[in-house]
Amino acid sequence: MERHLMDSQIKGVSTGTTILAVTFNGGVIIGSDSRASIGGSYVSSKTINKLIQVHDRIFCCIAGSLADAQAVTKAAKFQISFHSIQMESPPLVKAAASVLKELCYNNKEELQAGFITAGWDRKKGPQVYTVALGGMLLSQPFTIGGSGSTYIYGYADAKYKPDMSKEECLQFAKNALALAMGRDNVSGGVAHLVVITEEGVEHVVIPGDKLPKFHDE
């Protein structure tokens, strides 16, 4: 499967980070750690929520410069809401991802942030899109990003399977985040997860000491 690694060489306050999104049978799970750092060594916050709701059933997660990511998602939320009002219907997930793509492309010389967009809509159901530095848009059944993703590509490729149940997908996401947070010095804190289905949105927060443990920890 084609994979993408977010650029982790950032300046200023950074989200570090480990982010992911995974489709399952009937929905999608988007998740991240919660650590922010400066220069990759000083931990400026342990409780950053990197999962941003841009519409009812559409979320994005951020990697890179925190200021850049917040500015882009604020602009995206406005444009997506305006589009929804004009169309008199909820926005499609791909349309929301395309808004982020355009913002990233139009500001590619200044931005140091990448995004994963995930959600559910009535046209295509659960979807995951990677919006990379420079504005590339890629649709995938699952994706991982951020500095912590370096340590979990093998796990993700080996353990992901199509049409997982919600419970299987949650365990996959928990394990992936736990493995990355255990190895990557700029990923840590708690694990934030959001489950998105036709029925709605469910938020899950897992403290670091409640994450799955592995043999070398």
Swiss-Prot record:
Compartments where located: Cytoplasm; Nucleus
Molecular functions per Gene Ontology: threonine-type endopeptidase activity
GO cellular component, one term: cytoplasm
KW Hydrolase (keyword) present: yes
Example GO BP: proteolysis involved in protein catabolic process
Active site (UniProt): T17
Leading EC class: hydrolase
Segments crossing the lipid bilayer: none
EC code(s) of this entry: 3.4.25.1
Signal peptide: none
The entry's keywords: Cytoplasm, Hydrolase, Immunity, Nucleus, Protease, Proteasome, Threonine protease, Zymogen
Catalytic function, reaction form: Cleavage of peptide bonds with very broad specificity
Propiece span(s): 1-16
InterPro entries hit by this protein: Ntn_hydrolases_N (IPR029055), Pept_T1A_subB (IPR000243), Proteasome_bsu_CS (IPR016050), Proteasome_sua/b (IPR001353), Proteasome_suB-type (IPR023333)
Major subcellular site: cytoplasm
Statement: the UniProt record of this protein carries the keyword Protease: yes
Cited function: The proteasome is a multicatalytic proteinase complex which is characterized by its ability to cleave peptides with Arg, Phe, Tyr, Leu, and Glu adjacent to the leaving group at neutral or slightly basic pH. The proteasome has an ATP-dependent proteolytic activity. This subunit is involved in antigen processing to generate class I binding peptides.
Subunit structure: The 26S proteasome consists of a 20S proteasome core and two 19S regulatory subunits. The 20S proteasome core is composed of 28 subunits that are arranged in four stacked rings, resulting in a barrel-shaped structure. The two end rings are each formed by seven alpha subunits, and the two central rings are each formed by seven beta subunits. The catalytic chamber with the active sites is on the inside of the barrel.
Similarity annotation: Belongs to the peptidase T1B family.
Protein name: Proteasome subunit beta type-6-A like protein
